[in-house]
């Protein structure tokens, strides 16, 4: 299928398994599609999912032409970082913070060069424990800070899901469980997690 510029906004969700699963029935991309329908915007907005399980920012950089730029997006939502952090300790496949920033910067530049708006999302959680008690919390905060800084540097929109999830869990994780409130396994979103992402991401999209 070829894509040409037209009056319809084309939003591409670019990421890892969280975005891939976001295309499922109760995933956040599907929920955003329902909001588009409910607000009578179907003729104005088209969404495309471009999430692949296991991806790091390096992988996004390598496949951006094929999976994003070739489709002429008007807005590209970049939601990546979990595997970059998680892989450092789980499998040795993650990226150190310097390489993470370099490849993330490359992704932003490529998208902007294609005249697409950009929305950056910080990675949410690896574990739902409160008070910075999850093993990767420190790294997630450091990598999220890189994304926040890049959003300011390139003057693009930020959906700070890291802060959203941490604040939610601090308030509502009464029994301090490691998973089950917003995720199925500490990482991948359950229905409530998808709803939370949808609420904040849709507001960011509309204000973009």
Feature roles, as predicted:
Residues 1-53, 58-59, 63-72:
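Serine-esterase "nucleophile elbow" of acetyl-processing enzymes
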Residues 34-43, 58-208:
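Alpha-helical cap/lid subdomain in secreted, periplasmic
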């Amino acid at each position: 299928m070829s894509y040409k510029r037209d009056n319809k906004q084309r939003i591409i969700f670019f990421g890892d398994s969280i975005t891939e699963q976001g295309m499922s029935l109760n995933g956040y991309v599907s929920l955003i599609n329902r909001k588009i329908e409910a607000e009578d915007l179907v003729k104005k907005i088209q969404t495309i999912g471009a999430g692949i399980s296991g991806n790091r920012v390096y992988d996004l950089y390598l496949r951006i032409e094929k999976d994003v730029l070739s489709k002429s997006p008007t807005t590209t939502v970049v939601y990546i970082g979990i595997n970059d952090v998680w892989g450092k300790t789980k499998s040795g496949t993650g990226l150190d913070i310097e390489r993470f920033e370099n490849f993330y910067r490359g992704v932003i530049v490529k998208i902007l060069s294609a005249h697409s708006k950009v929305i950056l999302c910080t990675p949410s959680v690896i574990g739902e424990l409160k008070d910075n008690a999850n093993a990767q919390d420190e790294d997630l905060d450091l990598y999220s800070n890189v994304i926040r800084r890049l959003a300011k540097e390139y003057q693009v929109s930020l959906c700070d899901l890291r802060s959203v999830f941490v604040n939610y869990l601090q308030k509502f994780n009464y029994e301090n469980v490691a998973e089950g409130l917003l995720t199925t396994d500490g990482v991948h979103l359950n229905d409530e997690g998808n709803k939370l992402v949808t609420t904040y991401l849709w507001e960011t999209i509309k204000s973009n």
